[in-house]
Amino acid sequence: MKDDLRKIDKILLFLVTLMCIFGLVMIYSASSASTILRYYVAPNHFFVRQLIVLVVGYVFGFFVILFPTNRYKFLAYLYSLFVLVLLMYVLVKGKIAGNAQSWIAIGPFNLQPSEFAKSALILFMAVFYNNLSKRNTKNLSLYFIPLLLAGVYMLLTLLQPDWGSAAIIGAIAILTFLSVPMIKKNILKIMKIFVIGIIVLALALLYKGGNILSSNKLSRLNFKAPCTRYQEESGYQVCNALIAISNGGLFGVGLGQSSQKYLYLPESHTDMIFPIICEELGSIAGALTILLYGVILFKIFKIAKRSDNLRTSILAYGTFWYFTLHIFINLFGLLALIPLTGVPLPFLSYGGSYTLNAIFLIFVTERVAIENKKNKLKREIMSI
């Protein structure tokens, strides 16, 4: 046990923990007004709930670190099936909030199955492709099975509807799929299949697009200046996010002194927490936050590159894409560069289901780092 713990990537774990602590501070600050004015609860309500989730996540993560990835086989398939059942259940018995039926109420907490679908998909792909590589099969059609699972996850998530999570599930599946060696060798054949798929999807959208996309969703594709669109109501959130960033200047107005959190900026403690950081602590703090994300992503990518088997490689690459997609979609959305979809910012945004999955994947990556070092040591001993 001690030997395993010594092999973790200490810098990665330190940076993630630092971001989580910073996130707690900003969640308390960003939600201090809305807790009283909107939710009618104590000012520390979301802070305490997030702290509980983090403690649970880190305790569970300790066991994840000690659990070898070669034992994921049955658990990955069982986890994927369990998430599939949850995604179907939420459509029937789920809690409706924010025009989406995406949550399952469990006591005082709400479970969001679409968040667990992301980590379940990564584990499923890692185990499935690793098993397939051992069979040395050249049947390309078998490699598309995880994409079928991703498609089912996406469809069930779209029915809630949760466009942001559905897009990330699909993107994780495709980007991880393209990192498989067998797929890289047959990239031209694969691209032909993707082109056909895109054409079919485009025709389906042309035929049924009006029924799939509501006027609210279509309005988010309007990229003219968000504060001009504010008069049409579709640019309200982005406009107030940009106002918050502008208010902060270089050094900010001071911790806890945001004016936009007084219900001007909806969900300021969740997917809109970055503008509050910039308003209270300044653009310099915002830039440092992005820099820390860059270092975390670099560390995860290095762990993926050092993996010497397909299972651990896909686990780390899947985690890399998971965080990269969340960071870029969140930041690009609030800067009006892409449609706003309500995607949380890793380690900073409030959210139990997302935080648990983010922490879980970090500790899975730490387990991969441990196994990388163990395998390297074995090779060195054998070469003597």
Language-model features: where?
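Alpha-helical transmembrane segments of polytopic integral membrane proteins
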Residues: 21-27, 122, 126, 294-297, ...
